[in-house]
Amino acid sequence: VPIFHFSLTLLCSLLCLTTFYCRANTQGHIPSVRFAVNTPGSAPYLYYDESAKRYQGVVVDFFNADELSSQFRVVYLDSNRARSEDLLKSSSVDLFLSSESWISKPSSFLFSEELIKHESYIYSTTNFEGPFVPEENVSSSICTRYGFVYPALTPYFDREENNIDRVDSSSQSTMAMMLSRGRCDFAIMNEHNARSVMFDPKFCSTEFYQSPNVISRVSLVFVIRSGFTSLIDKIDIALKHFVESGQRQLSFERHSGVNQFPKAKC
């Protein structure tokens, strides 16, 4: 009987060790996918959380969902918008978040289904009397994100006379800070971006107003290196579930809140 118990115990131990090894071995062989981040990111989509010391956002939530997390591991690499295209062409990275209309050579890449409709507005510290019309606001200045493309405003930025002054900044947070301090007359950003930064307590004493009209509307998608069709197929399937299940909506609410403009003083 003691020998039987010993053998049974040994067998169970070996089974446990084998199971543990198989799980560890399986996890160790999950392939990595390299994601280029337009550093320091852009809340609520993808941003670096200083307290947690890692990237957070809707993109992270999407890739951490069960549909994809078991198939590959995402490695987030610091980059910038212009450089990301070159890195993708050279296969140094596998994908990044953008819009097809912002890409210089869209025929060189693959594009996923839409993550979200990206709608940009003009923001001000004073109320708008009506829709924002660029032609009626020449000689003004607009805070922008360095390296970002603004098709609706580019003709006015590029004029030699009667132009609108483009004031570049490194992030949406610094754009809002410059707007609050009068460094520019307006700021342009996506509604989700604006909600995530302008309702921060550091802007407690500032009022922010949103233009009644959308300045630009594009589809935000994952831009994937040419030939990586297996990845785009997996992403598109997961995106459908992410949207239809309500996970996308919950993720946006978690990372940008549910506040509505105008933003009043505290």
Question: What are these language model-derived features?
Answer:
Residues 57-69, 130, 134-148, 221-259:
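Extended ligand-binding regions for polar small-molecule ligands
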Residues 39-41, 117-121, 202-240, 258-266:
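Periplasmic-binding protein-like
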Residues 60, 73-137, 147-150, 211-214:
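Acidic, polar ligand-binding/catalytic clefts
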Residues 39-42, 51-52, 100-102, 125-129, ...:
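Short coil/turn segments
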Residues 86, 98-108, 155, 185-216:
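A ligand-binding cleft/hinge motif common to bilobed small-molecule-binding domains
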Residues 27-107, 168, 235, 255:
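Extracytoplasmic small-molecule ligand-binding "clamshell" domains
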Residues 7-18:
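Bacterial N-terminal signal peptides
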Residues 48-49, 63-70, 135-138, 146-169, ...:
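Ligand-binding cleft/hinge of the Venus flytrap
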